[in-house]
Swiss-Prot record:
It holds the Pfam family DUF489. It comes from the Bacteria. The keyword Membrane applies. One of its GO terms (cellular component) is cytoplasm. It is found in: Cytoplasm; Cell inner membrane. InterPro entries: HflD, HflD-like_sf. Belongs to the HflD family. Transmembrane segments: none annotated. This is High frequency lysogenization protein HflD homolog.
């Protein structure tokens, strides 16, 4: 993989929101890839996991590894949604469901605190084994199951039943869902709101198109 240069974080609030929302849809696309094929885009996966483990990033750009191309899968997926091009209904459903799940999480202070505490412990695991080691992924998946999946509102993942039941696949899917909620929280922190999406659609499309040119 060719390394990409570190970029400064975008100054535009809408661009930051677009990148954070692209992270949500990158997670949605990865969930769909795993559920249907058992494999996923490695760069997209690594970016999502590292962003979730880094609970105290130095900057906005640090969250996604310093270059927006680390969110390329999410940018392309979100662009298709915003431009009403052909997009997988399952991926759209996962993406917007992750935003809904984030909203429920924000209302539960105890769960937010628990997530933070357990992520700190999982960071220690990652330092020992590596960010994407299966022990770390298993812990992230268990964290999702113990917290976010206890809400009455749940995300139902559809795909190949034999793949979804294979070794480590439930953990990988749950870990990917957790990363999507992490980016949904980032989107909210940057001023993103569901009710604004309709009004900001053109601005988000413009921001995503500008990212395609760099």
């Amino acid at each position: 993989m060719t390394p990409t240069p570190i970029q400064n974080a975008p100054q535009s609030a809408v661009t930051r929101q677009a990148l954070a929302l692209a992270g949500v849809f990158q997670a949605a696309a990865v969930v769909d890839q795993l559920a249907r094929t058992g494999q996923c885009d490695e760069r997209a996966w690594n970016t999502l996991i590292r962003a979730t483990l880094d609970t105290n990033p130095d900057s906005f750009a640090t969250i996604y590894g310093g270059h927006h191309n680390n969110l390329r899968l999410g940018i392309d997926t979100l662009s298709a949604v915003m431009n009403r091009q052909h997009s997988d209904p399952a991926v759209m459903r996962y993406g917007f469901s992750l935003v809904l799940l984030m909203q429920k999480l924000r209302k539960d202070d105890a769960m937010m605190a628990s997530l933070g505490e357990r992520l700190t412990r999982i960071q220690g695991q990652a330092e020992h084994f590596g960010d994407t080691h299966e022990n770390v992924i298993a812990s992230l998946g268990q964290l999702y199951q113990d917290t976010l999946s206890t809400f009455r509102y749940r995300i139902v993942v559809q795909g190949d039943p034999s793949l979804l039941q294979s070794r480590m696949m439930p953990e990988r899917v749950r870990a990917a869902l957790l990363t999507g909620v992490r980016f949904a929280l980032l989107w909210h922190q940057q001023g993103g709101r569901r009710w604004k999406l309709l009004f900001q659609r053109q601005g988000i499309k413009k921001s995503l198109a500008a990212l395609d040119g760099h």
